[in-house]
A protein has these predicted regions:
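Basic, flexible linker segments flanking DNA-binding modules
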Residues: 1-38, 42, 109, 119-126, ...
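C-terminal domain-tail junction helix/linker
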Residues: 22-27, 36, 129-133, 154-213
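An active-site-proximal beta-strand-loop segment
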Residues: 35-73
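Short, solvent-exposed loop/turn segments at secondary-structure boundaries
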Residues: 51, 76-77, 113-118
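Active-site beta-loop-alpha junctions of metal-dependent nucleic acid enzymes
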Residues: 57-58, 74-102
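Short small-residue beta-strand/loop micro-motif enriched in glycine and branched aliphatics
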Residues: 70-75, 136-138, 162
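Acidic/histidine-rich, metal-coordinating catalytic segments
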Residues: 80, 98-116, 139-141, 146, ...
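RNase H-like polynucleotidyl transferase catalytic core
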Residues: 104-107, 124-147, 165-166
Length: 213
């Protein structure tokens, strides 16, 4: 009886182990200089703001925010796709006005491919690599890890989309552009009552003085 029981224990069915994807430990990094870390995300433009024929199209706002200076770049697009986010990343450095060392995104399909389904890189991932930008991904279901861009989107909802309506696509783009400029030139408590543009200007002015001395 004991031998048979031992054989049974040895040969009985065992449930296969499930391989789970591991994620790197989250390390908070607020940025020590402009471009060290930039958070990127996308939000939809509320339908109630659109007062012109959109013919079934939805509008989205792609946002990049520099952790050090809080400078932002906004872009309105018609689809939530790697095609649009890749176009955005290609012009990001020229629009920000400085080199970007790393960018952080969530795990949305408009940015990255699901590593559990394919080993291929998305167009966005390839583009980031070609510009020598380190790509960091937040952990799943952890929007707080991209907290600065998430909070800025909430402010956009209150200040821009909660107060205005747009009678044409041209007007939408114009108002978003004005909103971006106003944000980047407005003094903020977190920046010791300086604007994002002032923070960037002061940083590179100090760098130039160090090089000259």
């Amino acid at each position: 009886m004991g031998v048979c029981a031992g054989k049974y224990e040895k040969n009985r069915y065992r449930k296969p182990a499930i391989s789970r994807k591991s994620y790197t430990k989250y390390i908070r990094m607020d940025g020590r200089f402009p471009g060290e870390k930039v958070q990127v995300d996308i939000k939809y433009v509320p339908d109630e703001c659109i007062r012109f024929p959109s013919y079934g199209c939805r509008y989205y706002q792609i946002t990049a925010i520099d952790e050090y200076s809080r400078k932002r770049t906004l872009e309105i697009v018609k689809e939530k796709s790697t095609y649009e986010t890749t176009k955005f990343i290609k012009q990001l450095e020229s629009r920000m006005g400085f080199r970007i060392k790393s960018i952080q995104v969530d795990n949305g399909a408009e940015f990255v491919n699901d590593g559990d389904r394919t080993s291929k890189e998305s167009a966005f991932e390839k583009s980031s690599k070609s510009f020598e930008m380190q790509l960091r991904r937040t952990r799943p279901y952890s929007p707080w890890q991209n907290g600065k861009v998430e909070r800025s989107h909430r402010e956009d909802g209150k200040i821009l989309y909660g107060r205005k309506v747009f009678t044409s696509e041209k007007e939408l783009r114009k108002q978003v552009s004005k909103h971006e400029a106003r944000y980047n030139n407005t003094a903020k408590t977190v920046l010791n009552f300086r604007s994002p543009n002032e923070i960037v200007e002061e940083y590179f002015l100090k760098c130039n003085k160090c090089l000259d001395s």
